[in-house]
Amino acid sequence: MKTKLLVTGVALLFLAGCASYNGRGLVPGQSTAEEVQALMGAPAERRTAPDGDTILYYPRGPAGMHTYAVHVSPKGVMQSIDQLLTVDNLKKLVPGVTTTAQVREDFGPPARVSHLDRQQRDVWEYRMFGASQEPYNLFVQVSGDGIVREVLFLKDYNREPGGEGKG
């Protein structure tokens, strides 16, 4: 019996020490920035919003399919937590109009950035789920002036169950 309790206690301590993937347990309007970081770990990026909030970005990648943005008020209280990599957010990507700053705000840091020498453009890559929860790759091509030039949303056949070697 003592061994069982000891094993259970160690397991609970281990789980308590793990970072939360999506911030489960945090309460908007109550949880503090310190509690957010204690639960979710250090953010990959911090930005200051026009309203003075600090936005903490938690991409769960590079193979992950989610990026969470946690808004923290100037007083250090969490206001909201949002999953950014959604099909609805794709509507915000308008070639020739959307800026790289808007992409960073709406999608968070990319999983990978590559460069196209001939076109003198960068390609920001995100991995996410489509409307039917199938894996997709989002490629956002941006030019040197910081404007989105092309958006590709392609099904990722290599990440589908049994999809290795397809495509």
What is the predicted role of each segment?
Residues L15-G17:
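C-terminal motif of bacterial Sec signal peptides marking the signal peptidase cleavage site
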Residues M1-T8:
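Bacterial N-terminal signal peptides that target proteins for export
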Residues A19-G167:
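Residues within mature, well-folded domains
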